[in-house]
From Swiss-Prot:
NCBIfam families in UniProt: eno
Pathway field: Carbohydrate degradation; glycolysis; pyruvate from D-glyceraldehyde 3-phosphate: step 4/5
UniProt keywords, alphabetically: Cytoplasm, Glycolysis, Lyase, Magnesium, Metal-binding, Secreted
Assembly and interaction partners: Component of the RNA degradosome, a multiprotein complex involved in RNA processing and mRNA degradation.
Cofactor note as given: Binds a second Mg(2+) ion via substrate during catalysis.
Cofactor(s) named in the record: Mg(2+)
Protein name (record): Enolase
Family the entry assigns: Belongs to the enolase family.
Gene transcribed to yield this protein: eno
Length: 432
C-alpha cells in the first residue's frame, strides 16, 4: 500500500516572496505527502546547490521552473512504483540520478522537496505521525524529546536592513517545564522587548525571521535591551532564560579580518574576535554561539574552540553545512562542539539523519534549524522531536512561517505527553 503512483512538483512562494519548490508524493490507497523546500540568505559556500532559473524576466531570475521540471520529469519517472517506506532507497535513486556532488543537476530544492514529501506520504500509509516515522527511520523508535527553542528576537546581518552586524540574538527558555511553557515565555519576552524598544524611540519592524530589527549603537546593545525585556517579563536572565547568538561571521569577514561595520568598521583578527565574543559571554549568560568565525577559518575555529569550547556551545552552520564529510573532519580536528542541521544544505532526509547521528555519536549536539526563507511547512518540528535532537531554531514570535513550527511542537507535545520530555538546559552543550 506504499507504492508511489504519482509525483507532482510546483512553484510556490516563500516568506520572502521568492519562488520555491513544493512536491507531492501520492501512494496507492490515496495517501499523500506534501512538502516545500526552504531557502537561505546567509549561505555556506559548500551547501548543496539551490537551483534557480536565472531568467531575469521572471521573479528577477529566482524562478524554480527547472527544479520543478526535474520533479515532474526524471525524478518522478525514477521513483514511480517504488516503496515510499524505503526512504534511504528513494533518496539514493534521486541522488544517483542527479549524479553531482552538490545536487546541481536537479537542484537540492527539488530533491529535498520530494524526499520530505515521500516521508510524509509513508508516515500516512503507516497510519502514524511524521515524528514517529522519522524516529523509526532514525533507528530510535519511540525515543522522543521536545526541543529547547532558540528564539531569534533581534535580527541583524543578512536578515535585516539595520546596522547590526551579528545576525541573530536569541533567547532560550531553559527554565520551562514543557515546550508550550517555553513558547509562552518567549512570547512574553518578545512583547516586552517591543515595549523596551519603543521606550527608547527605536523601530519595532521585524526582519526575515520575525525578530525586531532596530538600529543599535553596538552589537552588545542588542544583548542589553533583551536583558531589559527578560527582566520586565518577570524572568531571571541566566536562570529561566539564557542567551544565544548566531554571528554568521562569514558575512563580515573581509581580507582576513572580521569587520563590524555597525561599530565604526572595527576590525578584528580571529583571536581578537574570539576574545570579543568571550567578553560578551562574561557580561551576559550567552550559552551558545553559532558561526563565530568565517567558514574557511579552521585555524581560528580551533583557537575559538580551545578558548570557549569547554564553557559554551559552539555551533557550526556555514562551517559544516549539514555535510557528514565536513563534519567528520571537524570532529577529528576538534572544531566546534555542535552542528546546525538544515536539511536543504545537504538536500535529503536520509543525509540529514546521518549528520545528526554522526554529531551525537561524537558527543556534539545537533540544533535543528529553519532557513530565513521559509514556508508554512513545519517538518522541522517533527524532525526535532523524532530525532530527540534537543534544540530547535525557528525564528521569533511573529510571522506565520515561523509560528507554524512552534504550533506544530505544541500539537506534538500534547500527543506525546510524558513520552517526550522537555529537558531544558541539559540539552545545551556545556550546560548540563
Amino acid at each position: 500500500m506504499s507504492k508511489i503512483v504519482k509525483v507532482i512538483g510546483r512553484e510556490i512562494i516563500d516568506s520572502r516572496g521568492n519562488p520555491t519548490v513544493e512536491a507531492e508524493v501520492h501512494l496507492e490507497g490515496g495517501f499523500v505527502g506534501m512538502a516545500a523546500a526552504p531557502s537561505g540568505a546567509s549561505t555556506g559556500s559548500r551547501e548543496a546547490l539551490e537551483l534557480r532559473d536565472g531568467d531575469k524576466s521572471r521573479f528577477l531570475g529566482k524562478g524554480v521552473t527547472k527544479a520543478v521540471g526535474a520533479v515532474n520529469g526524471p525524478i518522478a519517472q525514477a521513483i514511480l512504483g517504488k516503496d515510499a517506506k524505503d526512504q534511504a532507497g528513494i533518496d539514493k535513486i534521486m541522488i544517483d540520478l542527479d549524479g553531482t556532488e552538490n545536487k546541481s543537476n536537479f537542484g537540492a530544492n527539488a530533491i529535498l522537496a520530494v524526499s520530505l514529501a515521500n516521508a510524509k506520504a509513508a508516515a500516512a500509509a503507516k497510519g502514524m505521525p511524521l515524528y514517529e516515522h522519522i524516529a523509526e527511520l532514525n533507528g530510535t523508535p519511540g525515543k522522543y524529546s521536545m526541543p529547547v527553542p532558540m528564539m531569534n528576537i533581534i535580527n541583524g546581518g543578512e536578515h535585516a536592513d539595520n546596522n547590526v552586524d551579528i545576525q541573530e540574538f536569541m533567547i532560550q527558555p531553559v527554565g520551562a517545564k514543557t515546550v508550550k511553557e517555553a513558547i509562552r515565555m518567549g512570547s512574553e519576552v518578545f512583547h516586552h522587548l517591543a515595549k523596551v524598544l519603543k521606550g527608547k524611540g527605536m523601530n519595532t519592524a521585524v526582519g526575515d525571521e520575525g525578530g525586531y530589527a532596530p538600529n543599535l549603537g553596538s552589537n552588545a546593545e542588542a544583548l542589553a535591551v533583551i536583558a531589559e525585556a527578560v527582566k520586565a517579563a518577570g524572568y531571571e536572565l541566566g536562570k529561566n532564560i539564557t542567551l544565544a547568538m548566531d554571528c554568521a561571521a562569514s558575512e563580515f569577514y573581509k581580507d582576513g579580518k572580521y569587520v563590524l561595520a555597525g561599530e565604526g568598521n572595527k576590525a578584528f583578527t580571529s583571536e581578537e574576535f574570539t576574545h570579543f565574543l568571550e567578553e560578551l559571554t562574561k557580561q551576559y549568560p550567552i550559552v551558545s554561539i553559532e558561526d563565530g568565525l568565517d567558514e574557511s577559518d579552521w585555524d581560528g575555529f580551533a583557537y575559538q574552540t580551545k578558548v570557549l569550547g569547554d564553557k559554551i556551545q559552539l555551533v557550526g552552520d556555514d562551517l559544516f553545512v549539514t555535510n557528514t564529510k565536513i563534519l567528520k573532519e571537524g570532529i577529528e580536528k576538534g572544531i566546534a562542539n555542535s552542528i546546525l542541521i538544515k536539511f536543504n544544505q545537504i538536500g535529503s532526509l536520509t543525509e540529514t539523519l546521518a549528520a545528526i547521528k554522526m554529531a551525537k555519536d561524537a558527543g556534539y549536539t545537533a540544533v535543528i534549524s529553519h532557513r530565513s526563507g521559509e514556508t508554512e511547512d513545519a517538518t522541522i518540528a517533527d524532525l526535532a522531536v523524532g530525532t530527540a535532537a534537543g534544540q530547535i531554531k525557528t525564528g521569533s514570535m511573529s510571522r506565520s512561517d515561523r509560528v507554524a513550527k512552534y504550533n506544530q511542537l505544541i500539537r506534538i507535545e500534547e500527543a506525546l505527553g510524558e513520552k517526550a520530555p522537555y529537558n531544558g538546559r541539559k540539552e545545551i552543550k556545556g550546560q548540563a
